[in-house]
Amino acid sequence: MRFLLAFAFVLLSAGLASAADKENTLYIDLKDNCRVVIEMRPDLAPKHVAQIKKLAREGKYDGVVFHRVIDGFMAQTGDPDGTGMGGMGERLPSEFSKEPHGRGAVSMARTQDPNSARSQFFICFKDSNFLDGQYTVWGKVTSGMEHVDKIKKGEPPSNPDKMIKVQVAADAKD
C-alpha cells in the first residue's frame, strides 16, 4: 500500500512540475514553421517574466520585427514600432543577477537608465559576458537556437524577420 501511495505521489508531482514548466515556457514562432522555445526564469527576474507573459498573452508581440540583429552578438526585438525607440508595458526596475549572458541567453534591452526596460529583449548569439550584471537575464533558449542564428542581420535589417506568434506554452493550442 505504501508503495502505491508513493508511486501515486511521484506521478502527481511529475504532472505538477510539467504544468509549472509550461507556465514558464515561451514559444516564439518564426517564418517557415520554425519555433524557438525559451525557458523563462521567474527565480531570476520575476517582474520581467510577468511582463513578458502579460504582453505575450495580450498578443502584443505577434508580428513584431527583429529590428537590431548584430552578427556574432545578438538579435533584438519587442518594439511594436520596429525602430528600437518604442516599447510596451510599464517600466521595470532592474533585476540583475549573476546569470551569465551566454549563447541563447534572453535578456531585456533598456536605455542607459538601468530601470527603463519595458518590452524589448534580445537573444545572445554567443557568450557576451561584458553584459553580465548590467542587463536583466530572464530566460534561455532551450530549443530552436539554429533558427535564431538565421534571423536576418542588420541595424535595421532590410525586410526584417519577425515573430509571427508569441505564446506562453500553457496557453498554446498546438
Regions found by a protein language model. Name each.
Residues L5-L11, G15-D174:
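Cyclophilin-like peptidyl-prolyl cis-trans isomerases
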